Amino acid sequence: MVHMAEDKQDVGGAESTPPSILAKAFLVIGAFNERDRVLTLTQISRKTGLPKSTVHRLLQRLGELDVIEEHGAGYRLGIRLLQLVSSMPVDGMREVALPHLAQLQAWSKESVHFGVLRGNEVVVLQALFAVDHARPIGEVGTRIPAHLSAMGRAMMAYLREDELTELLSGPLVGITPKSITDPARIHEELKQVRVSGVAVQKDGVVLGLGNIAAPVLIKGRPMGAVAVQFDSSKQVSESVINAVKLTAHRICSDTTQMLAQGRGDLFPFDD
């Protein structure tokens, strides 16, 4: 599902062309996350790979725009970003999903996630972590190849055939020795998802960890997916499977109700 290496927000190929000023600015913004809310110039330079002089100039300009602000001896994201984020359509999905994710996390005592499909990747929109996790895995904004993710497969199972063909046509990267990258095997697993209503992955992203996910379907289309993390050495209980499916169903019901109330602008998916 949603597991990442140290200080990485994307899993995939590296950019081959030199980054533009805009790209560098986004690198600086992307250095911040739920774990690193305040960073020094040196920390930002180390995380982005940019020279300190470049980071300093970018921080000055972003500060003038209220995108970044000083905080003690470091920096944090500014109020302008909050204003922009609050106007994003995906924020409506997070609003609907959050109370149901909270119930699922409180019941399961495991980390839970809600993600959406963007191209050939899953993007984590909401994450609630188990209290005993020393390091959160799968923070908000994390991206992972859809074919490796339980959430990704849960949504892929309900794509149109042409969409699925396009998604699987490119190079399918693996992260661990147990990552599934064979298109034929992925197709077979997607058939099972349509029968069972859930997708399961074990050890495909991080050895020792697995996830079970259920899609949130609106008008037959995958709007998002809910996932629960578990120890891959253990079997997933029927109660967990049912809880994940019920959570996805509740998010679907609330979303359908909001659409009926004319709030379709919050949910950017096809009719």
Predicted features by range, described:
Residues E6-K8, H133-V205, D271:
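Short, solvent-exposed recognition segments
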Residues R76-G170:
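Amphipathic alpha-helical effector-binding/dimerization core
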